[in-house]
Amino acid sequence: MLKIKQEIYKNSLQVILKFFFALLCFCIILFPLLSYKINIQSRIFPAMEIIFIYYFMSLYSLNIFSIFFLGLLIDQISGMPIGTDSLVFVSANIIYKLSSKYFLAKNYLINFVVFCFYCLFILNFKYLLVTIKNLEVEGYLIIFFQSLTTIFSYNIIRLILDSPMDYFKKYAK
């Protein structure tokens, strides 16, 4: 009977911790919109989807189907043509998995350098796909600034996500 109560307690604690982590991720995305009236679609706002997908892909394993469906969801939210973000994220994931044989991505410095190239690849490939489809393009300088804000904000987001994730790993299992 005591083991059953402990198991129920652990399962409920795990659900609560996962909920708080999802709420934390949501607040990270929502905070700039409420505080500074900066929309997620704004070009000075960092590409949070790239940060979150890379974070969970590199430190924890995301499979290719979840990345594909996340890309479809991001397409629906951002108004991009269906499949654009999915193609970009799946391509970047394949390149990351093939190249990760040659380096250890758990090291912080290597992880950051790889993220810089990952971010540049995704933003440039997305820009290329948008210009091929003759959609509205505002210029390459905006993509450059968005990549800079994304790269600079990766460290902050990783600091925010790492300490709760360590806590969740310790108590959720």
From Swiss-Prot:
Keyword line: Cell membrane, Membrane, Transmembrane, Transmembrane helix
Subcellular location: Cell membrane
Annotated TM spans: 13-35, 50-72, 107-129, 139-161
Membrane topology: Multi-pass membrane protein
Listed name of the protein: Uncharacterized protein RP566
Taxonomic placement: Bacteria, Pseudomonadati, Pseudomonadota, Alphaproteobacteria, Rickettsiales
Species the sequence originates in: Rickettsia prowazekii (strain Madrid E)
GO cellular component: plasma membrane
